[in-house]
Amino acid sequence: MLCSIYKSPKKEGTYLYIPKRDDFSQVPDTLKQMFGKPIFVMLVNLEQRRLAQVNVEKVKQSMQEQGFFLQLPPPPENLLEQHKERKARQTP
């Protein structure tokens, strides 16, 4: 299964996967507005490639059911909270 991947110029780390290049007909208008003008990144064969941040099966299922897959960036790490938790565990 081939898919085209686009990145959002408005939301860093947000990517849109669609089955056909430049065919955004299945993407809701509200999502298109929030996403901004898509920037083409690459064409990928999902049968032959692993993806770094998302599960290939979830991408394929979403594209079959909805006609697209939206990848959101991972939540930011709160390094201060992690440091506080480590310190609390070290205190006797």
UniProtKB/Swiss-Prot annotation:
Coiled coil: none annotated. Pfam families: YcgL. Residues 69-92 are annotated as: Disordered. InterPro entries: YcgL-like_sf, YcgL_dom. It comes from the Bacteria. Residues 1-84 form the YcgL domain. HAMAP family: UPF0745. PANTHER family: PROTEIN YCGL (PTHR38109:SF1). This is YcgL domain-containing protein VC_1957.
